[in-house]
Amino acid sequence: MSHSVLKVPPSVIERMQSHYGPDITSLSVQGAVFQAKPQGCTITAYRSGKVLFQGKNAEKEAERWTADAETPAPKKPASKKSIPSVYQPPEGIGSMSVIGSDEVGTGDYFGPITVACVYADKAKLPLLKELGVKDSKNLKDPQIVQIARDLIKTVPYSLLVLRNEKYNEMQEKGMSQGKMKALLHNQAIGNLLKKLDGTRPEAILIDQFAEPAVYFKHLAGKTAVKERTYFSTKAEGIHLSVAAASIIARYSFLMEMDKLSKQAGITLPKGAGPLVDEAGAKLIKKHGEDALRVFTKLHFANTQKAKRIASKR
């Protein structure tokens, strides 16, 4: 069985816990902060900072985090790239006119999924840099708010918000989160292309969350935007359009979380860690278990943890 080990700081453990929220198991592993089981991989993050990736997709999942690692995983021997060449971003894409697409909220127990896409004309790339557009992971919330407010006045964009009640309804009907994301990205891109009214981007770049074949399989029966569409992990570092899309999506998520916190009467934390379990328990005590449907992604393991905490109070 393939495996990789990374050593990462606590801040990255928190980000990983948020990222893998839907896949976190309720199993208790000695010394572990969490264990998650995304497709083809078991990930165990320990309090020591070590993160163990096991399974056929171990190397692929570890690669997402190597840039953040204190001791990167050893280089693997050269092999065929997992993305078919037709979907790999072309050379020089960073200076092209591109639609970039990204999502936020998939690993957060509270709040919606927000998907944004941005058309960044190559003539506007210097302006985007001046506005402070870069990888949103390196920006704090106040910076996100300021830059996003400038962006929405500057670039053509499309934004979709999948709120919790609709999310839970779709999930209970058997739809995976991966399919939801594919549908949202495709719809947002289609909406933006209509806004552009004939202007053709040189490329469409999606921050990769699934293999291209799986992404398009999710869109079976829909009008899929496929021409000049490319996929890459860490796409925010490849083209500013994706970085801008991520900022707008995160801004929207923050605004939605503020609204939900006011509605709940308590501050709802981001992520899927212990603070979230505590907030979930407070929500249950204040509004009853039915309120979880409005505020949370019910299938996360946090639901049962919050119920257990609430039952003891």
Swiss-Prot record:
<feature type="binding site">
    <location>
        <position position="102"/>
    </location>
    <ligand>
        <name>a divalent metal cation</name>
    </ligand>
</feature>
<dbReference type="Pfam" id="PF01351">
    <property type="entry name" value="RNase_HII"/>
</dbReference>
<comment type="similarity">
    <text>Belongs to the RNase HII family. RnhC subfamily.</text>
</comment>
<dbReference type="Pfam" id="PF11858">
    <property type="entry name" value="DUF3378"/>
</dbReference>
<feature type="domain" description="RNase H type-2">
    <location>
        <begin position="96"/>
        <end position="312"/>
    </location>
</feature>
<keyword id="KW-0540">Nuclease</keyword>
<keyword id="KW-0963">Cytoplasm</keyword>
<feature type="binding site">
    <location>
        <position position="103"/>
    </location>
    <ligand>
        <name>a divalent metal cation</name>
    </ligand>
</feature>
<dbReference type="InterPro" id="IPR024568">
    <property type="entry name" value="RNase_HIII_N"/>
</dbReference>
<dbReference type="InterPro" id="IPR004641">
    <property type="entry name" value="RNase_HIII"/>
</dbReference>
<keyword id="KW-0378">Hydrolase</keyword>
<dbReference type="InterPro" id="IPR024567">
    <property type="entry name" value="RNase_HII/HIII_dom"/>
</dbReference>
<dbReference type="InterPro" id="IPR001352">
    <property type="entry name" value="RNase_HII/HIII"/>
</dbReference>
<comment type="function">
    <text>Endonuclease that specifically degrades the RNA of RNA-DNA hybrids.</text>
</comment>
<dbReference type="InterPro" id="IPR012337">
    <property type="entry name" value="RNaseH-like_sf"/>
</dbReference>
<keyword id="KW-0255">Endonuclease</keyword>
<dbReference type="GO" id="GO:0043137">
    <property type="term" value="P:DNA replication, removal of RNA primer"/>
</dbReference>
<keyword id="KW-0460">Magnesium</keyword>
<dbReference type="GO" id="GO:0004523">
    <property type="term" value="F:RNA-DNA hybrid ribonuclease activity"/>
</dbReference>
<protein>
    <recommendedName>
        <fullName>Ribonuclease HIII</fullName>
        <ecNumber>3.1.26.4</ecNumber>
    </recommendedName>
</protein>
<dbReference type="InterPro" id="IPR012295">
    <property type="entry name" value="TBP_dom_sf"/>
</dbReference>
<dbReference type="GO" id="GO:0003723">
    <property type="term" value="F:RNA binding"/>
</dbReference>
<dbReference type="GO" id="GO:0032299">
    <property type="term" value="C:ribonuclease H2 complex"/>
</dbReference>
<dbReference type="GO" id="GO:0000287">
    <property type="term" value="F:magnesium ion binding"/>
</dbReference>
<keyword id="KW-0479">Metal-binding</keyword>
<feature type="region of interest" description="Disordered">
    <location>
        <begin position="62"/>
        <end position="88"/>
    </location>
</feature>
<dbReference type="InterPro" id="IPR036397">
    <property type="entry name" value="RNaseH_sf"/>
</dbReference>
<dbReference type="GO" id="GO:0005737">
    <property type="term" value="C:cytoplasm"/>
</dbReference>
<feature type="binding site">
    <location>
        <position position="207"/>
    </location>
    <ligand>
        <name>a divalent metal cation</name>
    </ligand>
</feature>
<dbReference type="GO" id="GO:0006298">
    <property type="term" value="P:mismatch repair"/>
</dbReference>
